[in-house]
Curated annotation (Swiss-Prot):
Protein name (database record): GTPase-activating protein
Entry's Gene Ontology cellular component terms: cell cortex; cell cortex of cell tip; cell periphery; cortical dynamic polarity patch; cytosol; division septum; mating projection; nucleus
Keyword ATP-binding in record: no
Lineage of the organism: Eukaryota, Fungi, Dikarya, Ascomycota, Taphrinomycotina
Domain of life: Eukaryota
Keywords: GTPase activation
Record-level Gene Ontology MF annotations: GTPase activator activity
GO biological process: negative regulation of Ras protein signal transduction; positive regulation of mating projection assembly; signal transduction involved in positive regulation of conjugation with cellular fusion
Function: Inhibitory regulator of the Ras-cyclic AMP pathway. Stimulates the GTPase activity of Ras1.
Pfam name, any one: RasGAP_C
Site annotation Arginine finger: residues: R195
UniProt domain Ras-GAP: residue ranges: 170-410
Length: 766
């Protein structure tokens, strides 16, 4: 492209530079038509209607994804309670909470916000939160764990809820960069950063639940998953003791005399067991190769945001931990891409719209084993972490290298910062911004910010000023009043728009140039097919004159505006009037010639997203059915339970229930237990706090809200807390059924079953 020499503007004096390089780094045609959609265009050709259809489809997927996310969260919560309900071990108040969750209306009705003045203030607040990610980044790092899921839902599905809109996607990625950078700088153990249950890992996991990520998983894993699911009775468990018991139960092997004392090592030497493991390993590897090949061959389909996060992880690791090996960095990236993104979909395919119903036990175990093999390959530990027959190790090693090559290539994507700058300018200057949120989501965001306000932002910050005017947050409204409102975003401080003039990256010249290109493409689409002005090489003044001659006042104005833009660009020396207004003419020609190909690409994208939308709607029906089943359970259980004032009495201790008797329970519902007690009962497995000593430390446990707990560690004689962590009951329940039932909270490690029973004894039966 020829260098453009800019003239002098009142705003700044630009250097002689290659303008609009940012548009060279992305498909500018798509951008132009996004802009075109936001303008009240006179063009309503087939391209316009197709692009509008695609735009609406993306909006529907974004909206439905949020609704499914909320449903999945509540199904998980109710699923964790259903066992207690069936066993008649749920207190009356918990049953009321259970019933409330079942009666919630998941299809929020649109309405209006009850206070117009506060609506404008909230519009200014959410404008700041959306356009300046630093505010949310500070909040995410400090919010209490029991508020984390609610905050992430609002961030991912409301504040940045347009999941296919580049500006909001790039702002969200900017948020990730801020949070991850801070976490990487603060950690001493980078290897566990993305594997432990931290705010960062939960944020990244929630991000993968958005529409683009789920669409990708469906496109590459659907067939693989269903090829496994069509064989519900196929046994492919390769754990030696499990294989041994299967062979004994089916009469293929006589039981050993010391059957209950056998170990994995011993039974793995039995010829029948060894042969069975070898046969099953061969089948497992064949299936696993299909999954891996599907992922390895799909790098160009992986959403940009997922790849950019992988790039960010690699860059941060290289900068802050330069001595870490490349294979370890690949393992770190695999801790996000496979552990948080791909493998959860394999383990629970029904939650990712990959199966229409729950898999059989055999299929579930097979998929879990496949996911485990894939993760060990990504971690570079396939030779030590699987029970596969040793003869298959060379093939696993070969795939380790292939997977690591993929993990290296994932980060080979460009940055978005210049594109975001232009998107910000266009969004803030050319269209009204708005969010759709429920009343309670607005109030909850207000409450969370207010709780953390003094520790987050400068007292003179704009957020502080708005919160002072808003005052205390309102209490949540009943579900019937929790309507969905449109929240117009209000740019109260012009300085919040990116300082384009200072950075000299996107300037007035850039915007004029983009406007001109957009307008001339639009004019070409207005002219009849075969019109002389549409023939290449294009004559831009002829195009403008031809449209001006059409019998329409609005079209005449467009033609005049096109001539004015050419004159202005020529005066600014951004185009060469003596050389056919180059380089603008060449760019318009290229975009015009590529219209047919672009039309086909958009049609293919629309068709693919229609399939995704159908799957999301089907999954919504499945989740609604689950809630109906839980409702039946609740009604049945309630009919059998007689009200009692001694809910906590009469429970016998089951196997593994801890026998700790707390020394004192404070009025604030805080329980104090010694480290020795917790160690003796094997509740506490490990503590890596530097100041920790079993003899002179103690723990406090509290439950600030239903199913959320705070654990704090103190030194005797000191009031300052050494470590304080928050954990929700769902996380403990999930770890109880893991192969290694351990709850890792960073400095503290607990046995999941013992910790659950401790919570049950102290809080859940009250």
């Amino acid at each position: 492209m020829t260098k453009r020499h800019s003239g002098t503007l009142s705003s700044s004096v630009l250097p002689q530079t290659n303008r609009l390089s940012l548009l060279r780094n992305r498909e500018s045609t798509s951008v132009l038509y996004t802009i075109d959609l936001d303008m009240e265009s006179d063009v309503e050709d087939a391209f316009f209607h197709l692009d509008r259809e695609l735009h609406d489809l993306k909006q529907q997927i974004s909206s439905q994804s949020k609704q499914n996310f909320v449903l999945e969260r509540d199904v998980r919560y109710l699923d964790s309670k259903i066992a207690l309900l069936i066993q008649n071990r749920m207190a009356q108040e918990e049953q009321h909470e259970f019933a409330k969750r079942l009666n919630d209306n998941y299809n929020a009705v649109k309405g209006s916000f009850p206070d117009d003045r506060k609506l404008q203030l909230y519009g200014a607040l959410f404008f700041l939160l959306q356009s300046e990610p630093a505010y949310i980044a500070s909040l995410v790092r400090r919010v209490k764990l029991f508020n984390m899921d609610a905050l992430l839902q609002i961030v991912m599905f409301n504040i940045y809820g347009n999941q296919y809109e580049s500006r909001e996607e790039h702002l969200l990625l900017s948020l990730f960069q801020m949070v991850l950078t801070t976490e990487f700088e603060a950690t001493s153990d980078v290897l566990s950063l993305l594997r432990a249950n931290t705010p960062v890992s939960r944020m990244l996991t929630t991000y993968t639940r958005r529409g683009p990520g789920q669409a990708y998983l469906r496109s590459i894993l659907y067939q693989c998953i269903n090829d496994v699911a069509i064989h519900p009775d196929l046994q492919l468990d390769i754990h030696p003791l499990s294989v041994y018991r299967y062979l004994v139960n089916t009469g293929q092997l006589s039981p050993s005399e010391d059957d209950n004392l056998l170990t994995n090592e011993e039974v793995s030497e039995f010829p029948a067991v060894k042969n069975a493991i070898q046969e099953r390993s061969a089948q497992l590897l064949l299936l696993t190769k299909r999954f891996l090949d599907a992922v390895l061959n799909s790098i160009d389909e992986i959403p940009y945001g997922i790849r950019w996060v992988c790039k960010l992880i690699r860059n941060l690791t290289n900068r802050l931990f330069p001595s870490i090996s490349d294979s370890t960095i690949c393992s770190l990236i695999g801790g996000f891409f496979f552990l948080r993104f791909v493998n959860p979909a394999i383990i629970s395919p029904q939650t990712s719209m990959l199966l229409d119903s729950c898999p059989s036990d055999n299929v579930r175990k097979t998929l879990a084993t496949i996911a485990k093999i894939i993760q060990s390959v990504a971690n570079g530990t396939s030779s030590t972490k699987t029970h596969l027959d040793v003869s298959f190790q060379p093939m696993l090693k070969e795939y380790e290298e292939k997977v690591h090559n993929l993990l290296r290539k994932l980060g080979n994507v460009g940055d978005f910062f210049e594109a975001l700058e232009l998107d910000q300018y266009i969004a803030l200057s050319k269209k009204s911004l708005a969010l759709e949120m429920t009343v309670n989501e607005i109030y909850l965001t207000h409450e969370i910010i207010l709780e953390n306000l003094d520790n987050l932002y400068d007292p003179d910050s704009h957020v502080h000023l708005i919160l002072q005017e808003l005052g205390e947050p309102c209490k949540s409204v009943p579900q019937e009043d929790n309507c969905l409102v449109t929240l117009p975003l209000y740019n109260r401080w012009d300085s919040s728009i990116p300082d384009l003039k200072q950075n000299l990256k996107v300037t007035r010249e850039d915007i004029l140039y983009v406007d001109a290109k957009t307008l001339f493409i639009q004019l070409l689409r207005l002219l009849p097919s075969g019109h002389p002005a549409t023939r290449v090489p294009l004559d831009l003044p002829l195009i403008a004159d031809s449209v001006s001659s059409l019998k329409s006042m609005s079209l005449m104005k467009k033609g005049i505006r096109a001539i004015e833009l050419l004159d202005e660009l020529s005066t600014l020396r951004l185009v060469d009037k003596e050389n056919r207004y180059e380089p603008l003419t060449s760019e318009v020609e290229k975009e015009f010639i590529d219209l047919d190909a672009l039309y086909e690409r958009i049609r293919a994208e629309r068709d693919a997203l229609q399939d995704v939308h159908r799957a999301i709607c089907d999954h919504n029906e499945y989740l609604q059915t689950q809630l109906q089943i839980y409702g039946s359970y609740l009604n049945n259980a309630r009919s059998q339970i007689k009200p009692s004032h001694s809910d906590s009495k009469g429970f016998s201790r089951g196997v593994g229930v801890v026998g700790i008797k707390p020394k004192n329970i404070k009025s604030s519902n805080t329980v104090k237990l010694s480290s020795q007690q917790l160690k003796k009962e094997s509740v506490l497995l490990n503590c890596t706090i530097p100041e920790f000593n079993v003899s002179n430390t103690y723990f406090t446990f509290s439950s600030p809200s239903t199913d959320n707990f705070v654990i704090a560690v103190y030194q005797r004689g000191h009031s300052k807390v050494l470590v304080e962590v928050c954990i929700c009951l769902d996380d403990v329940l999930q770890r109880r059924y893991a192969s290694n039932p351990v709850v890792d909270l960073g400095f503290l490690t607990f046995e999941a079953n013992k910790l659950y029973h401790l919570f049950e004894q102290l809080f859940l039966r009250k």
